[in-house]
Amino acid sequence: MASRERSPALRIGIISDTHGSLDPRAYAALADCDHIIHAGDICGPAILRELETLAPVTAVLGNNDFDEYGSAVGHFAHPVLEGVRFLVGHKPGDVRVSFAGSAALAPGDPLPDVIIHGHTHVPELKTGPDARPAGIYLCPGAVYRPRSEFGRTLAKMDVEAGRILRTWVENLDEKVLMEA
């Protein structure tokens, strides 16, 4: 993103599946972020400490994570950033919300604007009917052992005053691969 001028919006970096290894290029790519979301399979508290040197971090447990992070990291997170509601979980089946409900949301919880998951190691960006009931459904891919032709990826999102201005997935060479 170095070639585009940055807006004054809050920039969120979204990462998943580090598996105990934070690629230096991923760290550098997240340096312009005001908040970081990690969608699980962190695999070591050192990863979160390293990310926290850049920005505040919201993280969830993945299927390879254990109780080594304390109570601040659970199976789901529901941050509200600049008025935008997020639902973050590791496995896609756990965060796919239907009108019948989900383990990720309690009765009466507001529906999220953005649903984020990890686990698949494949980037995915859906909007419109494919993202329902959210406006954006996102998997940032993986920075460790990617499972797609895109290689190692992460996502970013600019939000401001309750609006999602831009969402994109980029590889670690900062080439934009998907955008909404």
Residue locations for each model-derived region?
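Glycine/small-residue-rich loop that forms an oxyanion/phosphate-binding "nest" at active or ligand-binding sites
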Residues: 61-111
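N-terminal active-site segment of His-dependent metallophosphoesterases
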Residues: 1-57, 65-76, 83, 150-153, ...
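Conserved beta-sheet core of the metallophosphoesterase superfamily
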Residues: 58, 92-168
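Active-site metal-binding loops of divalent metal-dependent hydrolases
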Residues: 16-20, 40-42, 63-65, 91-93, ...
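A composition/secondary-structure signal for short, hydrophobic, low-basic-content segments
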Residues: 15, 86, 115-117
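Beta-strand-turn-beta hairpins that frame and shape the catalytic cleft
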Residues: 3-13, 78-87, 129-137, 159-168
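Short, solvent-exposed aromatic-acidic interface loops
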Residues: 167-179
